């Protein structure tokens, strides 16, 4: 199924690209979320009329994400206190939600879906650098310090 992308989508294409995707991906994900329209003559004309508006919206989202990335990078180490054993091993773990809540408490809004922990949840005390993906093109690093709770 051929579709016209209305947004930049990772591993697929940019705004305005006409791509061929499987019908199920288009029907169940791209079309309902408004990320694409079916590629036909009428939709192509409508898209070309709205192209400037969509590009401006995309640029605005990118600028907002860049501003948030600067705020996140400017943060000092975000401290999370958690119960831990004598050797620094946590009782439980620190996951995406915990990191997002700690950064939000520090003053910068962050959703748990934006936090990237490629090695899984944090299970030890110490200092960590956690990657945060705010936009497909914008990433930031959060300095995280996990300490033992008294």
From Swiss-Prot:
One of its GO terms (cellular component) is ribosome. Keywords: Ribonucleoprotein, Ribosomal protein, RNA-binding, rRNA-binding. GO terms for molecular function: rRNA binding; structural constituent of ribosome. It comes from the Bacteria. Binds to the 23S rRNA. HAMAP family: Ribosomal_bL9. Belongs to the bacterial ribosomal protein bL9 family. This is Large ribosomal subunit protein bL9. It comes from Shewanella piezotolerans (strain WP3 / JCM 13877). The gene is rplI.
